[in-house]
Amino acid sequence: MPALRSRTVTHGRNMAGARALLRATGVAREDFGKPIVAVANSYTQFVPGHVHLREVADVVADAVRAAGGVPREFNTIAVDDGIAMGHGGMLYSLPSRELIADAVEYMVNAHCADALVCVSNCDKITPGMLLAALRLNIPTVFVSGGPMEAGKVTVVNGTATTVRKLDLINPMIASADENVSEQELNALEEAACPTCGSCSGMFTANSMNCLTEAIGLALPGNGTVLATHTARKKLYEEAGRVVVEAARRYYEKDDESVLPLSIATPAAFANAMALDVAMGGSTNTILHLLAAATEAGVDFGLDDIDALSRRVPCLCKVAPNSDKYHIEDVHRAGGIPAIMGELARAGLVDTSLPMVHGMTVGEYVDAWDIASPNVRPEAVELFHAAPGGQRSTEAFSQSTRWDSLDLDRESGCIRSVKHAYTKDGGLAVLKGNLAPDGAVVKTAGVDEELWTFSGPAKVFESQEEAVDGILNKAVQPGDVVVIRYEGPKGGPGMQEMLYPTSFLKGRGLGKVCALITDGRFSGGTSGLSIGHASPEAAAGGDIALVEDGDIITIDIPNRSITLEVPEDELNARRERLLKELGGFRPRNRQRPVSAALRAYAAMATSASTGAARDVSQVERTHLHS
């Protein structure tokens, strides 16, 4: 039977100093011997998804204490991708994932914590904490801050007024539309983000919080209960109770089934990806799941994702893939248990797998899917939680309820497999000479008439250069915009291309152009936007050899992406490039890169493996220097 890790610092004569310090933090004599639960909070006033988490961690801590554990809270950093977008700050977003993982590892191991609650929410925080949880492999529960309410705006059109829902992406697109007045833009800006919480569409943050629920490390409702709703308080209380129970099962009963590596198995990764494909989640989720699989030592790669995308249909289209639905609507339709229920009934997920709350996937669906004949009353109650319609930066600030649930599986927010939006899933992996190791596209956000596309390349050496080109009308209808040297090493940091895609839409080019990059996309991106092209330009990928005017052909049904240039010409270009530049680097790009970012680039791997860190790259260099 494993001993409590915390005994290292709470027991033995020689640990008197450690106990003295713990006493100074409020730990009493009778607490020594109880499981110490690290509460990894990510509260910050910079990020709307995290601005309310100070109070949230207190609720978790109180629940841990009531269940017989000793809570110890600490903080991690949290980068807001939306604020960091469109300037040099975006270079730091993806690298922050590794910093967060390291910070959690450092704190938990330095203080010998027995279990972990991850209070996360936004884009890189949940993935960073997931990497740490898999690395540490101690009893862990994830509980996020919850999604933001969708914005609502009154649009004046002559004498008529209509109210429509919107989110962060709307003012971004409008800012590039010359037909939108400053007054209209200001109205959109003020209405887009009305409350605390992760941005209201199926963007990266909400996608990842839904996936932690599907993979089995979070509680029912984690991905969809609104940040402002009182119903979310029960989630935090339950997280505190469950983590102490999991710690007891492991340390007192030697039950390894509660450990992250026992839950996040290859089959669990497949379940999570099936959900992702079904709901048309952010392409960033592919990056993070691949990195998590690498951390867990799980054999799960792009080929597995490609196979799932061909087998699992798209059951849910939420902003930015649809103007009609946001996360609050997914919640009204039953949230993640409802989507998992539809997949389970079609035999598309493994229902035998364990989850941290003690149920199998099948039991979770049976109890929490509102379409199940055995649904629990508390599940029905939970999914009635609705937006409050008032500006708020506080957790638990409203308790509005829907008057009815969305049970329409034919044309509602969540559809059955029989009535799916498309028989293929909402994400796809493309391969070809332009991306032999793979590239990814969110098909749920692409109109089907664009699933095959061919056009001349318009090449840019950076995101900034591309933005200038789009706004200055250098990009024309039919072009394939190529943005390169923005990969994990080439950026470094693999910037998101939300501004280029938003500005293409703002200029009316969103449905007549394609965009390909070795960088990545925000979860708010839609349109024919293909990212993660691997190998990246900085690693010698053929994307470095594309020239203006080259024809690029995209064929989503056949999962191909082809640079229509003969191989001998590509080889000649490669030789010329190496002779001219001495390596694969952008021409005439002026970009300050700090030592911290250079350190990240030195250890970053390809997007095809999740841009996971590989320390051996540095170790090999050191050994051979």
From Swiss-Prot:
The organism of origin for this protein:
Thermobifida fusca (strain YX)
Q: Modified residue N6-carboxylysine is at which positions?
A: K124
Iron-sulfur: is it a keyword of this entry? yes
Note the HAMAP family from the entry.
IlvD
- Annotated protein name in UniProt: Dihydroxy-acid dehydratase
Q: Which reaction does it catalyse?
A: (2R)-2,3-dihydroxy-3-methylbutanoate = 3-methyl-2-oxobutanoate + H2O; (2R,3R)-2,3-dihydroxy-3-methylpentanoate = (S)-3-methyl-2-oxopentanoate + H2O
Give the cofactors, semicolon-separated: [2Fe-2S] cluster; Mg(2+)
Source organism superkingdom: Bacteria
Keyword Iron in the entry? The reply is: yes
Q: Which GO terms describe its molecular function?
A: 2 iron, 2 sulfur cluster binding; dihydroxy-acid dehydratase activity; magnesium ion binding
InterPro entries annotated for this entry? Answer: Dihydro-acid_dehy_C, DihydroxyA_deHydtase, DiOHA_6PGluconate_deHydtase_CS, ILV_EDD_C, ILV_EDD_N, IlvD/EDD_N
Q: Which GO terms describe its cellular component?
A: cytosol
